[in-house]
């Protein structure tokens, strides 16, 4: 594979070796000052990838019931990758967001609705003008319940697209969560630190039908 292949996922055998040292990040979330790493009792975690993680993270931190968010890398092979390595296409990772949420306030189903309605899940290894395997659409469930909900929601959204006259197939990857690696601190809450920064996400005008 070419070092700059942007359309095909690297194999585990060809992925970069990475490192053992985790990426240093701030202790507290820049927006709400909650812990960036701890998960309070009763809260749960979700992982989504839907393009450039700057806009995705902001989308989720604004939701009531979301305790914290973090930008990072998921679904790949290279341990503790850097942003530059992920952008090379040689780690297998997608730009992803870790969401810690209170299920008593916001459900996983509501997070899935936000996911489907705010990006284009048909574009394969890109999202809008952002091209590369790191920009693929993906859901990384942590439990059998999350996995079942993710698959069911994909079927409902595909049906809703068809009903709206959009016959493109969904390319969203749904795979059991592998280790999530935090991105460099400069990427955390990027659009809070840089309010006029780039945000490349946007929906296709289709709503996710409710779970029957």
From Swiss-Prot:
Any coiled-coil regions, as ranges: none
Record-level GO cellular component terms: cytoplasm
UniProt GO BP: cellular response to oxidative stress; protein modification process
Record GO terms (molecular function): L-methionine-(S)-S-oxide reductase activity; peptide-methionine (S)-S-oxide reductase activity
Record-annotated active site: 52
Catalytic reaction equation(s): L-methionyl-[protein] + [thioredoxin]-disulfide + H2O = L-methionyl-(S)-S-oxide-[protein] + [thioredoxin]-dithiol; [thioredoxin]-disulfide + L-methionine + H2O = L-methionine (S)-S-oxide + [thioredoxin]-dithiol
UniProt keyword terms in alphabetical order: Oxidoreductase
Enzyme Commission number, as recorded: 1.8.4.11
InterPro entries: Met_Sox_Rdtase_MsrA_dom (IPR002569), Met_Sox_Rdtase_MsrA_sf (IPR036509), MsrA_MetSO_reductase (IPR050162)
Keyword check for Signal: no
Superkingdom assignment: Bacteria
The keyword Signal belongs to this UniProt entry's keyword annotation: no
Function: Has an important function as a repair enzyme for proteins that have been inactivated by oxidation. Catalyzes the reversible oxidation-reduction of methionine sulfoxide in proteins to methionine.
Family statement drawn from the similarity comment of this UniProt entry: Belongs to the MsrA Met sulfoxide reductase family.
Name the record gives this protein: Peptide methionine sulfoxide reductase MsrA
Record organism: Salmonella typhimurium (strain LT2 / SGSC1412 / ATCC 700720)
Gene (UniProt): msrA
């Amino acid at each position: 594979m070419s070092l700059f292949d942007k359309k095909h996922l690297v194999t585990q055998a060809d992925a970069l070796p990475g490192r053992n040292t985790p990426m240093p990040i701030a202790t507290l979330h820049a927006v709400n000052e909650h812990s960036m790493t701890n998960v309070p009792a009763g809260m749960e975690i979700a992982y989504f990838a839907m393009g450039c993680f700057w806009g995705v993270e902001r989308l989720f931190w604004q939701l009531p019931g979301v305790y914290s968010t973090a930008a990072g890398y998921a679904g790949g092979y290279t341990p503790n990758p850097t942003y530059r390595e992920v952008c090379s296409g040689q780690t297998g990772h997608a730009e992803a967001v870790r969401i810690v949420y209170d299920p008593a306030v916001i459900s996983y189903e509501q997070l899935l609705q936000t996911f489907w309605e705010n990006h284009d899940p048909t574009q394969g290894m890109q999202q809008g003008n952002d091209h590369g395997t790191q920009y693929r659409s993906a859901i990384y469930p942590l439990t059998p319940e999350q996995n079942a909900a993710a698959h069911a929601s994909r079927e409902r959204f595909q049906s809703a697209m068809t009903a709206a006259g959009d016959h493109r197939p969904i390319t969203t990857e749904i795979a059991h969560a592998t280790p999530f690696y935090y991105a460099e601190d400069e990427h955390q809450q990027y659009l809070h630190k840089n309010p006029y920064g780039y945000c490349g996400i946007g929906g296709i005008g289709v709503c996710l039908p409710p779970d029957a």
